[in-house]
């Protein structure tokens, strides 16, 4: 008689993964992605040189906290030595928790300075109630930070602008100023004395927000300009968020396009010599009519018109 073997029992479902462990792994992957993107931006634009003293402008927002955190992590394994100093500008805003940043930075063991300058009173006095304060506030803030950098041997000034800031600035310039311009990942400061770098240039704002939440940074809200509604940047930001929801990857494509400019396919005569295009190499340039003659011809009228 042939033995009847018992049917194999179905394998039990694996035990559900611990949600805390899964969250930790996701946060670890996020941190590594941000480090990789920051390192790539630094390499692509030559942001950091050996011996640089980098001033990290720390506002107390998620972006600047993430910037400092990334640079501290990269500093430990960077191919070149550089130093960091975190600098916060105390603008004397009402109810500003002045103790938060010093306590946080002391806990990290990071060299830091608090620059006190009452820009709040200046802005409040000059700007009418209900008007946007961001532009004037930004200029005053830059002046104070540049002055500190000048007197303390700073060679690079690191700002926390991210990919979405850069794309938003592009559209603000396009919509409101009729020019194609954004934020450069690296540029000369307004006073001409320093180089400004934006190591978060490749990082999405959503990733920064998630990272800041995971790291539990002590976020300080901006009560001066960040809470004002209907600002141009907020409007553009909402547009970008809508695009990300409806067409994932569109904002990333726009960001990449900022690094692939084709002057010959635009209309800026200072970037491309349209007058020389199509001109015979043997034809003397003196035979070309004065461009102003075409303008005069365009204005000419006849009795039959």
From Swiss-Prot:
The keyword Endoplasmic reticulum does not apply. GO terms for molecular function: 4 iron, 4 sulfur cluster binding; ATP binding; magnesium ion binding; sulfurtransferase activity; tRNA binding. Residues 1-20, 282-305 are annotated as: Disordered. It catalyses: cytidine(32) in tRNA + S-sulfanyl-L-cysteinyl-[cysteine desulfurase] + AH2 + ATP = 2-thiocytidine(32) in tRNA + L-cysteinyl-[cysteine desulfurase] + A + AMP + diphosphate + H(+). A motif (PP-loop motif) lies at residues 59-64. It is found in: Cytoplasm. Keywords: 4Fe-4S, ATP-binding, Cytoplasm, Iron, Iron-sulfur, Magnesium, Metal-binding, Nucleotide-binding, RNA-binding, Transferase, tRNA processing, tRNA-binding. The thiolation reaction likely consists of two steps: a first activation step by ATP to form an adenylated intermediate of the target base of tRNA, and a second nucleophilic substitution step of the sulfur (S) atom supplied by the hydrosulfide attached to the Fe-S cluster. This is tRNA-cytidine(32) 2-sulfurtransferase. It comes from Xanthomonas axonopodis pv. citri (strain 306).
